Curated annotation (Swiss-Prot):
The gene is rhlB. Gene3D superfamilies: P-loop containing nucleotide triphosphate hydrolases. Component of the RNA degradosome, which is a multiprotein complex involved in RNA processing and mRNA degradation. One of its GO terms (molecular function) is RNA helicase activity. It is an enzyme of class 3 (hydrolase). Belongs to the DEAD box helicase family. RhlB subfamily. This is ATP-dependent RNA helicase RhlB. Residues 39-219 form the Helicase ATP-binding domain. It is found in: Cytoplasm. Residues 242-392 form the Helicase C-terminal domain. It catalyses: ATP + H2O = ADP + phosphate + H(+). It comes from Pseudomonas syringae pv. tomato (strain ATCC BAA-871 / DC3000). The keyword Cytoplasm applies. A motif (Q motif) lies at residues 8-36. GO terms for biological process: RNA catabolic process.
């Protein structure tokens, strides 16, 4: 890979050959800004705090750092099967599964074993993987990890590197007491490397970082470039009663094949999905109420194009990395401007063009000024063409 001005190559970090081989297989030529920033510190063993949204390459940043550390340092001569050397804690099941998939891709030429613990999946099945081989990298949600830890199946006293991903989301979801319990089981902060990532640096997040890290390097990637220029943003002013008609007609008139629809509440997500299915659209839903095995099946179906419309809440939609999503529709505007950036970041990934369409009704249009302030620009409100507001003709079997 030729040197290019202003860009850092993975090659420049002198990584282990088996790791470089995996990076080349994935077709990553140059580091993203967060990768270049974080790796410059973490490969020297320093703690780091990174501010970056999903879609910036932060997952690969911390995984490359972990894998390099574990391949360069031999494992302890004696350890239990359930004593991971690296621990990654993330708030949602989808995010854990995605991180583990990326970790499997990056470790394929090494002897490192990656394991996942998530709630909603068979406890015994997860226990069997622990009993079968040593665990090098453990990716887990806080609750399920605590279950294993309290039952004495997992010991965290040999953790060399700990990563807390989406710390702001963990705060929002009330996971911090569980995370504290977990961290108490790991070596003292001066004896392990700690990396913390968050989409926002609130006072609460920085307080946690201070408690859990030692003299960390701070890497901030401006989030504005995540609402990327290749996502065309539209806002339709539409009455709440007309939102479903507009959604249905947009999808079916245009023949869109891979669409993500976001709503703020689980009951809204369920209602939208049920109506779409009733009206003959191949749709599925993702929310905290959907059992894990079904969520994984749903994501696979969406990735493979069997599911046309995926309706999700913000928490469930976080960390979904599926290329080829052509449109994101905000059925309701999010209450937190950061969530708007996250939502529209599901489309226009990997340099592709994408379109986001937001429905602003009487109940949620007041969120617009804060979203525009976050984006640093105005988005003009359009009136939808009348043919897109026509009544939905009920399907007859």
């Amino acid at each position: 890979m030729e040197p290019q001005e202003g860009k850092t190559r993975f090659h420049d970090f002198n990584l282990a050959p088996e790791l470089m081989h995996a990076i080349q297989d994935l077709g990553f030529p140059y580091c993203t800004p967060i990768q270049a920033g974080v790796l410059g510190f973490t490969l020297k063993g320093k703690d780091a705090i990174g501010r970056a949204q999903t879609g910036t390459g932060k997952t690969a940043a911390f995984l490359i750092s972990i894998i390099e550390q574990l391949t360069q340092t031999p494992p302890p001569a004696e350890r239990y099967m359930g004593e991971p050397r690296a621990l990654i804690i993330a708030p949602t099941r989808e995010l854990v599964v995605q991180i583990a998939k990326d970790a499997a891709d990056l470790t394929k030429y090494t002897n490192l074993n990656v394991m996942t613990f998530v709630g909603g999946m068979d406890f015994d099945k997860q226990l069997k993987q622990l009993e079968a081989r040593h665990c090098d990298i453990l990716v887990a949600t806080p609750g399920r990890l605590l279950d294993f830890n309290q039952r004495g199946e997992v010991h965290l006293d040999m953790v060399e590197v700990m990563v807390l991903d989406e710390a702001d989301r963990m705060l929002d979801m009330g996971f911090i007491p569980q995370v504290r319990q977990i961290i108490r089981q790991t070596p003292h902060k001066g004896e392990r490397q700690t990396l913390l990532f968050s989409a926002t640096f609130t006072e609460d997040v920085m307080n946690l970082a201070k408690q859990w890290t030692t003299d960390p390097s701070i890497v901030e990637i401006e989030s504005l470039n995540v609402a990327s220029d290749n996502v065309e943003q539209h806002i339709y002013a539409v009455a709440g009663a007309d939102k479903y008609k507009l959604l249905y007609n947009l999808v079916t008139d245009n023949g869109w094949e891979r669409v993500m629809v976001f709503a703020n509440r689980k009951d809204e997500v369920r209602r939208i999905e049920e109506r779409l299915v009733r009206d003959g659209v191949n749709a599925a839903q993702l929310s905290g109420d959907v059992p894990q095995h079904k969520r994984i099946k749903t994501l696979e179906g969406f990735r493979e194009g069997k599911i046309r419309v995926l309706v999700a809440t913000d928490v469930a939609g976080r960390g979904i990395h599926i290329d080829g999503i052509s449109h994101v529709i905000n059925f309701t505007l999010p209450e937190v401007p950061d969530d708007y950036v996250h939502r529209i970041g599901r489309t226009g990934r990997a340099g592709a063009d994408g379109v986001s369409i937001s429905f602003a009704g009487e109940d949620d249009s007041y969120q617009l000024p804060a979203i525009e302030e976050k984006l640093g620009r105005k988005i003009s409100c359009e009136t939808p063409p009348t043919h897109l507001l026509r009544a939905v003709v009920r399907q007859t079997n």
